[in-house]
Amino acid sequence: MPQGGIDEGESPQQAALRELEEETGVTSARILKESAGWHDYELPKDLWGTALKGKFRGQTQRWFAMEFDGSEDEIDIGEKPTQKAEFDQWKWEVSDKLPGLIIPFKRKVYKAVIDEFSEFLV
């Protein structure tokens, strides 16, 4: 599930679509719903100073449910000339399995987002 920062002058919606394209190559998607609020997590203390470029102890995020209406050959998680790959694999998965696939300190956020967007998920 792509994530990233909001650039200056950019709306959260624009940032979500940009991050989706940067991290997966996907441009054939549309926003269905924006989360009602912001979701946050804190890094475990042993990651302070190293994760998130060493500058932050966690993140506050706005989430979006999107519909992908392209074909799978559009998905490209490989390294780009100006950007290192952020993922080494991808797969479609049913929503109730997603929290188990993510690092433990982000699971609470994933569960909340899945609950909030349940009307769109399988």
Residue positions per predicted region:
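Unchanged
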Residues: I6-P104
